[in-house]
Design a protein with these regions (language model features):
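Short, intrinsically disordered low-complexity segments
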Residues: 1-3, 10, 59-62, 71-73
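N-terminal strand-loop-strand
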Residues: 1-28
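Small/flexible residues
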Residues: 4-6, 21, 62-65, 76
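A generic structural signal for ordered secondary structure
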Residues: 8, 14-16, 77-79, 115-117
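Residue-level signal for pocket-adjacent positions within structured domains
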Residues: 21-23, 28, 59, 81, ...
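Unchanged
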Residues: 33-57, 64-115
Length: 117
């Protein structure tokens, strides 16, 4: 099972979600850790590589293992002043989700966000 550094970025009551190219569902930004890389460092690195956003503040908040998931999510709350922009060919799009609109998303998105509220 791989370790995934997962970012939660809030702004104006919305959370940042991304959709990989060729996928139908949205997820929280993040990605796998490199060899011996801390999960929060991976979350920060992926946010910058994929969306050009630099963390102003980061806090690792919890770890989540979900049944049926191929990843262990190590979740960090990230604060940034940067606006997202697509920089990585792996991503198709990003959205600021109000957590109310019915959008296609992976179940871990709801499970992680429920732990924060």
């Amino acid at each position: 099972m791989r370790i995934r550094g997962t970012s939660v970025v809030f702004r104006d009551g919305k959370v940042l979600l991304v959709r990989d190219r060729g996928k139908l569902k949205f997820s929280l930004p993040g990605g796998g850790t490199h060899h011996h890389e801390p999960s929060m460092a991976a979350a920060i690195r992926e946010l910058h590589e994929e969306l050009g956003m630099r963390a102003r503040k980061a806090e690792r908040i919890f770890r989540c293992d979900f049944e049926g998931s191929q990843s262990k999510h190590k979740v960090s709350l990230i604060e940034t002043d940067d606006e997202p922009r697509l920089r990585d060919k792996e991503l198709e799009e990003f959205i600021w989700w109000d957590m109310k609109a019915d959008i296609p998303r992976f179940s871990h998105v709801d499970q992680i966000l429920e732990k924060l509220t």
